[in-house]
Amino acid sequence: MTYLSKKVFLYALLGLFSAAAWGQTADGGNEGARTVVVGVDHSPPYRILDAGRQSGLYLDIFNEVADRLGWQVEYEQVPFRRILLLMQEGKVDVMLGPVRTENRAAYMAYATAAFPPERRLFFYREPENRVTQYSDLYGKSIGVLEGARYFERFDKDDQLKKSTAPRYQNLMLMLEKGRVEVVVAPELAGISAARDVQVEVEVSPFSVPGERSWIAISRKSPILEYADEIAEVVEAIRQEGLMERLVTKYSNLAVK
C-alpha cells in the first residue's frame, strides 16, 4: 500500500554515464528511460496493490521522485520478508519504507528518510489482552509481520511469544480467531488492515513512538549512485508542500 524548488537535476557526467549503462538518452527523456524495479507488499495506506491499483502514500511519493528523475517504475509485489531477500540479491533496486537497522545496512543503502514516523500500536479484542505497559506483553501471543522491525527492545526480546504472518490483514484475522492475543503494527497500517478484513479491534493505551522510514537502495543496484539525487527530490517535494498533502490524504483515508 504508497511523507527547493523544482530545479532538481542529475549531474551531467552521471547522466552521460547512465545513458551508456542504461541505454537512456542523455537528456533524461522518455526514449529508452531507465526502469527502476521496486519491491513492494500490499500494506495500505502506504502501499496499495489491489485489483490492479498501484497507489498509496509511499508509491505516490516515489512515483513523483521517479517522474522528476525521468525514470520508469516497475513494481514487483512480494511479501515483505521476500523483499528483503531480493534487496540482498540485487534483484530489486529499491524498497519503500523499511526502518533503518544495522543488519539491513549491510545490503541496502538508506537514501533518505522520506516517510513520516508512526506510533507502534497494540491491537486486541478481549479485555484481558489490553496492554497498558510493556510488561503486559509477557505471556501473551503477539502477531508480527514477517521480517518487520518495530522497536529495539521488542525486536530483541526473546522472552516474548511472537507469531508471524506475511500481511497485517492476516494478523488481524488471526486475532479474530484467537490464534494471537495482540497484534503490533504501525498505526495507519493496523487500522487499515482491521478495516479491510472487517475485524473489530481495540487499541491499547500503551504505544511506542515510531521512527522515520526510508527509501532504500540495494547495494547491488546500479541506481545506488543516484542516492543523493533521490534525497534532493524528496526534499523538494517536502518544501513544496506535496509531502504534507499526500500524508493528509492517506491519513484521512485510513481512519474513515
What are the language-model segments listed below?
Residues 11-20:
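Bacterial N-terminal signal peptides
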Residues 23-24, 149-163, 203-205, 234-256:
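Ligand-binding clefts/hinges and TM-proximal coupling segments of bilobed small-molecule sensing domains
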Residues 25-102, 106, 144:
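Extracytoplasmic small-molecule ligand-binding "clamshell" domains
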Residues 40-42, 117-121, 195-231, 253-256:
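Periplasmic-binding protein-like
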Residues 41-44, 52-64, 126-159, 164-166, ...:
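Bilobed "Venus flytrap"/periplasmic-binding protein-like clamshell domains
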Residues 59-68, 128, 135, 140-141, ...:
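Extended ligand-binding regions for polar small-molecule ligands
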Residues 63, 75-136, 147-148, 204-209:
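Acidic, polar ligand-binding/catalytic clefts
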Residues 74-85, 163-173, 177:
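Short helix-initiation/N-cap motifs at beta->coil->alpha
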